Amino acid sequence: MGKKRTKGRSAPDTVASESAEPVCRHLRKGLEQGNLKKALVNVEWNICQDCKTDNKVKDKPEEEAEDPSVWLCLKCGHQGCGRDSQEQHALKHYTTPRSEPHYLVLSLDNWSVWCYKCDEEVKYCSSNRLGQVVDYVRKQAGVRTSKPAEKNNGHIELENKKLEKESKNEQEREKSENLAKETIPMDSASQITVKGLSNLGNTCFFNAVMQNLSQTPVLRELLKEVKMSGTIVKIEPPDLALTEPLEVNLEPPGPLTLAMSQFLSEMQENKKRVVTPKELFSQVCKKATRFKGYQQQDSQELLRYLLDGMRAEEHQRVSKGILKAFGNSTEKLDEEVKNKVKDYEKKKAIPSFVDRIFGGELTSTIMCDECRTVSLVHESFLDLSLPVLDDQSGKKSINDKNVKMTMEEEDKDSEEEKDDSYMKSRSDLPSGTSKHLQKKAKKQAKKQAKNQRRQQKIQERFLHFNELCATDYTEDNEREADTALAGEVEVDTDSTHGSQEEATQIELSVNQKDLDGQESMIERTPDVQESPEDLGVKSANTESDLGIVTPAPECPRDFNGAFLEERTSGELDIINGLKNLNLNAAVDPDEINIEIPNDSHSAPKVYEVMNEDPETAFCTLANREAFSTDECSIQHCLYQFTRNEKLQDANKLLCEVCSRRQCNGPKANIKGDRRHVYTNAKKQMLVSLAPPVLTLHLKRFQQAGFNLRKVNKHIKFPEILDLAPFCTLKCKNVAEESTRVLYSLYGVVEHSGTMRSGHYTAYAKERTASCHLSNLVLHGDIPQDCEMESTKGQWFHISDTHVQAVPITKVLNSQAYLLFYERIL
C-alpha cells in the first residue's frame, strides 16, 4: 500500500523533459495498452466511475462543489477521483487486492503519471512506451499533440501552483478576494468574476475570445431569456389585409446556444477557479469543422463562427416555430404554405440576441457628380475589420503608377485589338479580395492555353445565343447598329453597342469565374464598386456586400504586378454576350429593382435612392479631420475605414439617372438595350446604427505575394472611444442633438509571436454590470448625456489558466488584435 499524500496532482518541473528517462521499475506490470484501448471506447471522460455509480456526482455538498481531479488507471482504464477528494476512489482502486497490481495512474487534468508503489511522479518523454500510451489517451480524450508534456509544461506548473495555494493556503485566497472587493465594490447580483480557462490543446485563440465574452454581462442576461421555456413571439403579418399577428411558440435553443449559456454560468460560479470549456469548444467544432484537430487558429474567425452559429440556430428556431404555427410539422408542404412561411420569415419580427448585442449597421452613401443623385446601401455588421498600415505608402504609389500606365496603354491599343488574333498574351486581373484569385493570377501564365480554350467555348456558346435572339431585335436596333457613333466598338450586329471605354469597363467587371467556363450574373442596376484604396479596408463581413448591384470596373492596387487585362475584340464579344444573356429586358426603367440574395446566415442589404440634400449627405455627428494624421491610432484606422472616396477613371459609377437622360426619356428600346453612362461620384461608408457592444478587429495578418506576414506596429487605442466622427448625421440609437457616441473599453485580445508560432492572451476588465447598457439592449432605452456611468474597474491579464491583475497602462500598451467596447453614452 502506498503512503497517502496530501497532493497527488503536483508534478515536478522536469516532468515533461524530452531527455528524461523513466526511473520507475513498475512500468512493465502497471502498463497494459491492450486493456486501455478496450476500456476507452465510448467512455465518459473526467468523471469518476465509482462516484457516478454511487450517484454522488450530482448530490455533492457545497464544500465539494469543485470537481475533484480524475485519475486514469493505465492497467485497466478505470477512472477514479484523486486523493484531494473525499472518496479517493483512485487510491481505493489501487489498494483493492488483485492478481496483478495496478500501480500507474494518469491525471486527466495535467497529464502527469503517478506510481502508487513508488509514491512519486513518473517521468516520461514522447519517444518511450509510456509517452506513447499517454499520447494515445490524450488523442482519445480530444487533446491531440505530439509533445504533450513539453507544450503544456508551463500551464501544468501554473495550475499545480494554483491548486497548492488553494488547498494549503486558504487564507491567502480569501485575502486576494477581499482585496478585489475593496478595489471594486460590487453588488453580488451584478458581479463579474474572472477565471482561468484550461487549454485543451492549442486553444488559446478560443480561450482569449471566451474570456472577453464572459465579461459581457448583457449576453448572459439575454441567454437567460432565450433559455426560458414556452417563449412566444408575435410576428406581424406580411399581408396588410391580415390584422392579427402570428403567435409563434419557440422550441428550446440549439446545442451551441445552450453550451454557451452553460459556459457563462460556470464562469460566474464562486467555487471554481479554472473552467474547462470542453463542451462549448466541441459544439463550435461541430458547427465549423475547420477548428477540429487542435491546430493554431485565428481568434477573430473563431468569434465570427461562434456568433454566426448561434444566430443561425435562432433563425432556425423561429422558422420551425412559424411552421408549427401553420399546423405543418412534416417536411412535405404545399406551395401556398411554403410561400406564407417565407413571407413571415422575411418580416424578422425580433432580431436574434446576437444582433441585439453586437449588431450594428453601415451605410454606404454614393452621390453622382453629374445629377447629384444620392443612393444608400445599408448592411449590418457584427464587427469592424480595420486596416493596419505598415509603411506601404511607397509601394502603393508604385502600384498606382503601374495601374495608370496600363490603363493608358489599353486605351491606346483598343482600336488595334479589333484586328489582333485571339491568341494574345495578357495578365489576368485578380479581384483583390480573394486569396484564391491572387494565387491564380500569379499562376496565370501556366494556365494561359487552358483558359483560352475555355474562352473560345464560351464565345461559341454566346455567339450562338445571339444568333438565336437576332430575330427578336426591332428595326430601331438595326438602325442604331448602322448609325453607330464613330469610335464605338461594334461587338455584334444585333447586340449592344458602346464606346471603347464602355466596352473596356464592361469587360473588366466580369468575374474571374468566367475564365473557367462558368456563367456569371451581371445585373443592370445602379451601384458603385469598392475603390482600389478600399480593398483591405472594409470589415471581413462587409467586403463583398456591395456586390448586390452592378459594379463599376475597378483596378486593384494592393498587389505588386497587378495589371489590367488586355482583351481582343473576340473577348469583348463574350463579355457583351454575357451581358445580353443575363439582363432582364422587361424591367421598367422607372423602377429601380435590386436583387438581394436570400441568405439566412447573413443580414440582407437594403438599397434605396434618397432625395437627400447633397450638402449634408456626407456629414458626420462630429468633426473627423483631427484623426487624419495620427496613423498609429485606432481612430485613424476608423478614419481610413470611413474616408470619403472619389469614384473616377476605372472606378466610375454606373448612374441609372444619367443613363435615362442619355436615352432622352425613361423608356429604352424593347430589349432594354441602351447606353450605360458612367460618371464620377463620391462614396463614403459610415456607421448608421451604433451597436451596444462594438467589436474592432485590427487586420495584422496580411499576405504579401506568396508570403504571409504579421504587422507588429503598435496601434494606440483609448479607454473611452468616441464613435461620433464615424457615424452618419442621422445615426440611430443616438439621443437627439447629441454629438457624442461614447464607448468604454472592457476587453482586449492580444496576439504575441509570429504568424507561424504565436500565443493569444486576453485582457479583461472586472467591473459592475452597466444597467444603462442592459436597458439599451433589452428595452431600447437610448443613454442620455446626464446618465453616463462610471467606467471604474480592475483589469486582469489572462493567459489560459493564469490570471493576474494588471494596471490600465499595461493594457493600453498591448499589441491589440481584437478590441471590445461597450456603449456608455
Curated annotation (Swiss-Prot):
Q: Which modifications occur after translation, per UniProt?
A: Phosphorylated at the onset of mitosis and dephosphorylated during the metaphase/anaphase transition. Phosphorylation by AURKB enhances the deubiquitinase activity.
Against Gene3D superfamilies, the record matches this protein to: Cysteine proteinases (3.90.70.10), Zinc/RING finger domain, C3HC4 (zinc finger) (3.30.40.10)
- Point out residues bearing the modification Phosphoserine: S188, S414, S520, S531
Q: Cellular component terms, GO, for this chain's entry?
A: cytoplasm; nucleus
| Positions annotated to bind Zn(2+) 1 | C24, H26, C115, C118
The record's InterPro entries line, in alphabetical order, gives: Papain-like_cys_pep_sf (IPR038765), Peptidase_C19 (IPR050164), Peptidase_C19_UCH (IPR001394), UBP16 (IPR030849), USP_CS (IPR018200), USP_dom (IPR028889), Znf_RING/FYVE/PHD (IPR013083), Znf_UBP (IPR001607)
Annotated USP domain ranges read 195-824
Q: Which Pfam families match?
A: UCH (PF00443), zf-UBP (PF02148)
Biological process (GO), any one? cell division
Q: Which residues form a coiled coil?
A: none
GO function term, MF aspect, one: cysteine-type endopeptidase activity
**PANTHER family xrefs:** UBIQUITIN CARBOXYL-TERMINAL HYDROLASE (PTHR24006:SF852)
Function recorded in the entry: Specifically deubiquitinates 'Lys-120' of histone H2A (H2AK119Ub), a specific tag for epigenetic transcriptional repression, thereby acting as a coactivator. Deubiquitination of histone H2A is a prerequisite for subsequent phosphorylation at 'Ser-11' of histone H3 (H3S10ph), and is required for chromosome segregation when cells enter into mitosis. In resting B- and T-lymphocytes, phosphorylation by AURKB leads to enhance its activity, thereby maintaining transcription in resting lymphocytes. Regulates Hox gene expression via histone H2A deubiquitination. Prefers nucleosomal substrates.
Question: Domains: what does the record tell us?
Answer: The UBP-type zinc finger binds 3 zinc ions that form a pair of cross-braced ring fingers encapsulated within a third zinc finger in the primary structure. It recognizes the C-terminal tail of free ubiquitin.
Question: What is the recorded name of this protein?
Answer: Ubiquitin carboxyl-terminal hydrolase 16
User: Origin organism of this chain?
Assistant: Mus musculus (Mouse)
Q: What is the lineage of its organism?
A: Eukaryota, Metazoa, Chordata, Craniata, Vertebrata
